[in-house]
Amino acid sequence: MGKSESSVGMMERADNCGRRRLGFVECGLLVLLTLLLMGAIVTLGVFYSIGKQLPLLNSLLHVSRHERTVVKRVLRDSSQKSDICTTPSCVIAAARILQNMDQSKKPCDNFYQYACGGWLRHHVIPETNSRYSVFDILRDELEVILKGVLEDSSVQHRPAVEKAKTLYRSCMNQSVIEKRDSEPLLNVLDMIGGWPVAMDKWNETMGPKWELERQLAVLNSQFNRRVLIDLFIWNDDQNSSRHVIYIDQPTLGMPSREYYFKEDSHRVREAYLQFMTSVATMLRRDLNLPGETDLVQEEMAQVLHLETHLANATVPQEKRHDVTALYHRMGLEELQERFGLKGFNWTLFIQNVLSSVQVELLPNEEVVVYGIPYLENLEEIIDVFPAQTLQNYLVWRLVLDRIGSLSQRFKEARVDYRKALYGTTMEEVRWRECVSYVNSNMESAVGSLYIKRAFSKDSKSIVSELIEKIRSVFVDNLDELNWMDEESKKKAQEKALNIREQIGYPDYILEDNNRHLDEEYSSLTFSEDLYFENGLQNLKNNAQRSLKKLREKVDQNLWIIGAAVVNAFYSPNRNLIVFPAGILQPPFFSKDQPQALNFGGIGMVIGHEITHGFDDNGRNFDKNGNMLDWWSNFSARHFRQQSQCMIYQYSNFSWELADNQNVNGFSTLGENIADNGGVRQAYKAYLQWLAEGGRDQRLPGLNLTYAQLFFINYAQVWCGSYRPEFAIQSIKTDVHSPLNAQVLGSLQNLPGFSEAFHCPRGSPMHPMNRCRIW
C-alpha cells in the first residue's frame, strides 16, 4: 500500500613493498593486512526494498566541469603518502575491502565481480540460510549483541525490558515446549471453532452455527491473521493526519501467487500439500482419532484447491504499483452493494473486528478498498466451496503461522517444504530464532538494550549533517533535469526540503522517567513456561494496538521501526526517512573511517531513501504525505518515459541462479530508481565535501583513489549469494533487483563511475546509452 540506487589503465597495483618503494610503516601495515585478511570481520549491511525499449531522453548525463576539477584534485591528492590512515579502524577496513575484492577482474567489464569476487569466493551459504550476504553477516553480529543483553541477569531493568527477557527465556525453554507438545495448539483450535480435518463430525457439531464473518473477525482481531479478506487500519492516503479502514486482497500461505499454478513450481506445491497433510494427521492422532491418511489428504487437497482459486483471484504485485488506481473510498452501504459475496455481512464483520477494542462503527463510516478486482472474484469462490473447506483453510493459516512455536516434530514436518521453497536443510540455531522473535515483537524494549550496549550517541548529529548534504544535492540536481518543468521542480524541491528524518532511536526508550516504553507493553504478562501462549499474547497485542488507532489522530513522531534493525526506510504517508541504529555502524558509517566509505555507505543509503520519495510510488504523495497529484502533465509524461528506459535496462539482466529468468524491470522499478538516485547523490555530495576543503584519508595497502574507494565500498555492501530455490522465489516476489544487478545497473548509468575507473565508452560499465531519472 501507499504506506511503505578507452581503458587508460586500471588502477595501479602494489603487489609487494619493493615495487613502489613503500616506507617501513607502510610495509609493516601491508604485512599486518595480510594476517588480518582471514580474520577481518565483515560487518556491512544492505537493505534490500518488462518492457520494450523506448527512445531515451538525454537528461544531462555529463559530468560537470566543476566535478571534473574535483575528481582531478582527488586523483592528485590520492597520490600523497601523508594522507594514509593507520588507525585500527582503517587497517580493519582496508583488510575487509582487500579480502572482498577480486583484482584479477577488470572493473570496466564487471564491477560487481571486481568488488565482490573475493567475498563470493570466501563465503559459503550456511545450511540454515537461503541467502548469505554482508547484510546477513551484520545482522548475525547484531543478534550476538542482543543475545548477550537478553541473557544478562545481573541487572534488574524496567518492566518492559524484563518482559522481553522473560519472553526470550520462554522461547529458549525447549524442554517445556517439547513436554507440552501439541497441547497449546489444540486448546486454540477449540477457541476458533475447531479444525474440521482434525475432528469428527464437524458439519454436525460446529457447522450449523458457523459464520464466515465472525471467523474472519476472530482471526483478525485476536490472532492478527488477516485471511481471505485483509482488513487493517492505516493512515488515509488522501489525508495523512487521520486513520481509516482499508480492505485489500490477502496474503497467501505460500510466498507468491505463481507457486500455485506455474508448472515449474510443482515440487513446492507437492511439498506444501504434504506439510499440511502431515500436521493434520499428527493432530488427529494426538486427539486419539484414526489417522485416515486418505481422508486427510483429500481434505487438504481441497484446501490447496481453494487457495489456488484465491491466488488466481489476486492481482499480481507488478500491476498494483499505482496507488492512485488502487484507492477507492466508499461507505458501508456501497461496499455491501458492490461486494455482496453471497450474503456476506460487511457491517457485522467490521464491527466484530472493532468491538475487540471497544470501537463502534459510525453510521457514515467510510472504508478504502484497495482490492476491488479480488473482491469481485471472491464471490464466486465463496459460493463454490463449502463451509468445512473454508474453515479448514482459515485454521490452516493460523496453524501455519504457529508451527515454529511447537515441539520439534512439528518443525520436522515442514523440512521438505522449506527445502523446496528456500533450499535450506537445517533450522536456525535456537537462540538466533528466539532473539529475532523477541526483537520483532518488542522492538522498543530490545532497542533500548542495544543502544546502551553498542551505539555511540554522537552518531545522530553526524548522520544528520550527512542527510542535509545529500538532501541539498538532490535539490541542486533538479536543475539538471530537462524532462521536468519548473513548476514540478519547485514542488519537488518543497517535498525534499520537508522530508523529516528519524535517526538511531527514539529518545524515550532511554529515559527512565518516561513511562511510555512500559505502557507500550502494559497488556502483556509473560510466563517462562508458556511460550506458545506468550506468542498468542503478542499476536493479540499487535492486532489491537493497530485497530485502536482508527479513532486516534496520526502521531507523526511515532517510530515506524525498532532501533536494533539493519535496514533503512522511507514512509510516503509521513514523508519520513528512518535510519535505525543497527545500520549506523562500520562499514556503513563510522567517524573513524575515511569519508569516502561513509559517503559510499550510509551516504548512499540516505540518498536511496530520499529518492524513494520520488520513485514510481512515492511521487504520488506530496510534502505532507498526502496522495496528491502535484505533477504537471508534461513532467508526469516524461517521468514515465524516463522510467521506461530503466525498466528496459533492468529487464535485460538475467539471473543464472533463477533458471536464467530475467529481472522484472517493472516490479523492481521503485528500488532501481532509488539505487540510481542514491549513489548519484552520495557521490556528488562527496565531491562537494572535498571541494569545500574536506581532507580525506587513504587506506593502507590499497592503491585506490578516493573516488574508487567510494564506489568499491558502495558495491561491497551488496556482496552476497543465494540458493537457487530462493533465487527463484526472489525473482518472483522481491521488489529489489538481484544484488549484482543493483550494483551494475546503477553504476552503468553514472558518468562519475566510468571516469573514476577510466572505462571507455562502449565497455560493459560505460554503455552507449544511459538512463537517468533523478
UniProtKB/Swiss-Prot annotation:
Inhibited by thiorphan and phosphoramidon. Its EC number is 3.4.24.11. It is an enzyme of class 3 (hydrolase). GO terms for molecular function: endopeptidase activity; metalloendopeptidase activity; zinc ion binding. Residues 84-774 form the Peptidase M13 domain. The chain crosses the membrane at residues 27-47. Glycans are attached at residues 173, 203, 239, 312, 345, 633, 652, 703. The active site is at 609, 675 (proton donor). InterPro entries: MetalloPept_cat_dom_sf, Peptidase_M13, Peptidase_M13_C, Peptidase_M13_dom_2, Peptidase_M13_N. Disulfide bonds join 85-90, 108-759, 116-719, 171-434, 645-771. This is Membrane metallo-endopeptidase-like 1. It comes from Rattus norvegicus (Rat).
